[in-house]
């Protein structure tokens, strides 16, 4: 196993060097291809912009932010610390040697506004064992920043990119030769780039949300022993070969929301009140998904998460292709428990892709009422 891990690291380093060599090609070709020219600020102008530091929070919650931009573009400072850690992902004690941004699966949701400059400090503590980087699907050039942020244990890097596109986007680790292993070990998150004037229905109506929740759907691939029991390992490197063998079957053993079966159900349910307008950001970095709110609807849905597009209306289920982030807006109208699921019901009920909303308020008989209670014939 040690030799395999060493070979893997050499492959990663070689790949990183190749990616670095490609960087001038990628960046030099990007400007002319841009369909929407954006004024280029000089280094001096960027240095003079106001700066704002984000205090990120763990999902399903989202840091404090304004829905409309205040003033002009800013430099938004973000720090993401990589943490390799064991996570228990179900009630049976099944473990995964997770790779995470800031210790959670998914990594924190970052919220900025279009045309802000996002300055990310990526920290790989010396307590980790592997090389990592970060690829922002919202960024332009250098493999989403992946070619510029390769950090070994004990290193850090600082990347700045301009958030030119409005929408919800994936970010994930993408070390050369090992991308799927890192992503399916939990190393992904999302960034939401809001339009500077806030969300609309595409026809001029403002869409203001009272709450925003961030759900990360994660597929895990846990090896089994000869008795069919899930195996446990001391480190990610020790688990590597067995995990990749399961990954190649394209058959997850677990598909969960926010890192574990039941992480967002029961006592951990998301909360809302009748009349509250809730934005649900749905994150899946690897597979297609089909969110459905049982008892409710997608009042406005950006299926691929891009706010320049007119949202779909009154959806029962919406399709989010992987790897894409989607967003849905809903005003809760009845109290009770709502199940939010991947409506591939096998994945929801058998593998774990389910969450609950617990909604308080007064019941509306006009929307639903019992005409006759269940009784014998």
Curated annotation (Swiss-Prot):
It is an enzyme of class 1 (oxidoreductase). Its EC number is 1.7.2.1. Residues 1-35 form the signal peptide. Residues 99-194, 259-360 form the Plastocyanin-like domain. Gene3D superfamilies: Cupredoxins - blue copper proteins (2.60.40.420). GO terms for cellular component: periplasmic space. Predicted to be exported by the Tat system. The position of the signal peptide cleavage has not been experimentally proven. Cu cation 2 binds at residues 137, 172, 343. Its main location: periplasm. Keywords: Copper, FAD, Flavoprotein, Metal-binding, Nitrate assimilation, Oxidoreductase, Periplasm, Repeat, Signal. InterPro entries: Cu-oxidase-like_N (IPR011707), Cu-oxidase_2nd (IPR001117), Cupredoxin (IPR008972), NO2-reductase_Cu (IPR001287), TAT_signal (IPR006311). The keyword Zinc does not apply. It catalyses: nitric oxide + Fe(III)-[cytochrome c] + H2O = Fe(II)-[cytochrome c] + nitrite + 2 H(+). Its cofactor is Cu(2+); Cu(+); FAD. GO terms for biological process: denitrification pathway; nitrate assimilation. Cu cation 1 binds at residues 132, 173, 182, 187. Binds 1 Cu(2+) ion. The Cu(2+) ion is held by residues from each of 2 monomers of the trimer. Nitrite is bound to the Cu(2+) ion site. Pseudoazurin is the physiological electron donor for the Cu-NIR in vitro. Binds 1 Cu(+) ion. The Cu(+) ion is bound within a single monomer. Pathway: Nitrogen metabolism; nitrate reduction (denitrification); dinitrogen from nitrate: step 2/4. GO terms for molecular function: copper ion binding; nitrite reductase (NO-forming) activity. It is found in: Periplasm. The keyword Iron does not apply. Homotrimer. The type I copper site in NIR plays a crucial role for electron transfer from pseudoazurin to the type II copper site of NIR, which comprises the catalytic center of NIR for the reduction of nitrite. NCBIfam families: Cu_nitrite_red. Belongs to the multicopper oxidase family. This is Copper-containing nitrite reductase. It comes from Rhizobium sullae. The lineage of its organism: Bacteria, Pseudomonadati, Pseudomonadota, Alphaproteobacteria, Hyphomicrobiales. The gene is nirK.
């Amino acid at each position: 196993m040690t030799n395999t891990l060493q070979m893997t690291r050499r492959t990663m380093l070689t790949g990183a060097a190749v990616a670095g060599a490609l960087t001038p090609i990628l960046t030099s070709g990007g400007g002319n291809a841009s369909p929407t020219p954006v004024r280029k600020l000089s280094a001096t102008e960027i240095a003079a912009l106001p700066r704002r530091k984000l205090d990120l929070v763990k999902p399903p919650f989202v840091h404090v932010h304004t829905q409309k931009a205040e003033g002009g573009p800013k430099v938004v400072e973000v720090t993401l610390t990589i943490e390799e850690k064991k996570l228990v992902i179900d009630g049976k004690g099944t473990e995964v040697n997770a790779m995470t941004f800031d210790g959670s699966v998914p990594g924190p949701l970052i919220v900025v506004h279009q045309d802000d400059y996002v300055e990310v400090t990526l920290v790989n503590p010396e307590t980790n064992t592997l090389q990592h980087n970060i690829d922002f699907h919202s960024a332009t050039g250098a493999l989403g920043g992946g070619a510029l942020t390769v950090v070994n244990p004990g290193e850090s890097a600082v990347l700045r990119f301009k958030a030119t596109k409005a929408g919800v986007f994936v970010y994930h680790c993408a070390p050369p030769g090992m991308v799927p292993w890192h992503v399916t070990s939990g190393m992904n998150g999302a960034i939401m780039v809001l339009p500077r004037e806030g969300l609309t229905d595409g026809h001029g109506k403002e869409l203001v949300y009272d709450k925003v929740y961030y759900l990360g759907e994660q597929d895990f691939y846990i090896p089994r022993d000869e008795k069919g029991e899930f195996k446990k390992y001391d480190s990610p490197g020790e688990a590597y070969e067995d995990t990749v063998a399961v990954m190649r079957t394209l058959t997850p053993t677990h598909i969960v929301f926010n890192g574990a079966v039941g992480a967002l159900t029961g006592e951990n349910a998301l909360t809302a009140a009748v009349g509250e307008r809730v934005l649900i950001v749905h994150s899946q970095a690897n597979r297609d998904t089909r969110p459905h709110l049982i008892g409710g609807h997608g009042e406005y849905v950006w299926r691929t998460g891009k706010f320049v597009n007119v949202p779909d209306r009154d959806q029962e289920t919406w399709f989010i292709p992987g790897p894409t982030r989607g967003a849905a807006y809903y005003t809760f109208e009845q109290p009770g428990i709502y199940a939010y699921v991947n409506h591939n019901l096998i994945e929801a009920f058998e593998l774990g892709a389910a969450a609950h909303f617990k909604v308080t308020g007064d019941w509306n008989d006009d929307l639903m009422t019992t005409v006759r209670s269940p009784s014998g014939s």
